Amino acid sequence: MENTATAPNAKLEVKNLNFYYGKFHAIRNVNMSIRENKVTAFIGPSGCGKSTLLRTFNRMFELYPGQRAEGEILLDGENLLTSKTDISLIRAKVGMVFQKPTPFPMSIYDNIAFGVRLFERLSKGEMDERVEWALSKAALWNEVKDKLHQSGNSLSGGQQQRLCIARGVAIKPEVLLLDEPCSALDPISTAKIEELIAELKHEYTVVIVTHNMQQAARCSDYTAYMYLGELMEYGATDQIFVKPARKETEDYITGRFG
């Protein structure tokens, strides 16, 4: 297992992280560094804690009562888990795209502009440029440029997910979290999302949770295997899939477990 606790070029550093649903200890003493401008994938069986861990990175768990995190999550050295940290700024810096496409009930244009308006005051011309820029980043602009004022819900499932990614990058975050972004999509849409992830890492630090191990192998630079709330192994994706250090990791990857 690679020692990533003090990795160079770390964008996020997780130190002694524990997470609780009420009294249930869901994540146990996780320590890891997530490198800047790389794609890090979390794999593991259902209920292992990978999506829970992802939601600690932008404190999304605080939307639900009885959940708490202990330890440190450092973004460029700043602990995101302290009460002094502005949660709206955290979510501007650490964007999130969910498993099911969740376009807002408004136009394609306003889906992109909505978050930008919360943090910036742009002129109409500047906002038009930002909307085009974000949709282009999500490889969606050419498909929707003539129907920006139609509902986001009028798009196909794959287009809706790319709209959600565009919405996430529009506020120019530093980290983009993707929680099973392709699980509800067909193979063609999935391939487009995977191509997009490869492009996004040049400007963002990308963290993805996936049940699809082939997707993790294709898309990620680093892979973390979780089991029962513990980080079992974490290292370069090629190493994890070709020569894992732990038998538990090998058993999961080869289908003997999970």
UniProtKB/Swiss-Prot annotation:
Keyword Zinc-finger carried by entry: no
Binding site for ATP: 44-51
Ranges for domain ABC transporter: 12-253
InterPro entries found in the cross-reference section: AAA+_ATPase (IPR003593), ABC_transporter-like_ATP-bd (IPR003439), ABC_transporter-like_CS (IPR017871), P-loop_NTPase (IPR027417), PstB-like (IPR005670)
Pfam families for the chain: ABC_tran (PF00005)
GO molecular function: ATP binding; ATP hydrolysis activity; ATPase-coupled phosphate ion transmembrane transporter activity
Top-level taxonomic group: Bacteria
Annotated catalysed reactions: phosphate(out) + ATP + H2O = ADP + 2 phosphate(in) + H(+)
Membrane topology: Peripheral membrane protein
Location, primary (coarse class): membrane
Leading EC class: translocase
GO cellular component: plasma membrane
The keyword Cell membrane belongs to this UniProt entry's keyword annotation: yes
Subunit structure: The complex is composed of two ATP-binding proteins (PstB), two transmembrane proteins (PstC and PstA) and a solute-binding protein (PstS).
Record-stated family: Belongs to the ABC transporter superfamily. Phosphate importer (TC 3.A.1.7) family.
Summary of the function given for this chain in its UniProt record: Part of the ABC transporter complex PstSACB involved in phosphate import. Responsible for energy coupling to the transport system.
Classification via PANTHER family: ABC TRANSPORTER I FAMILY MEMBER 17, PHOSPHATE IMPORT ATP-BINDING PROTEIN PSTB
Protein name: Phosphate import ATP-binding protein PstB
UniProt organism field: Bordetella parapertussis (strain 12822 / ATCC BAA-587 / NCTC 13253)
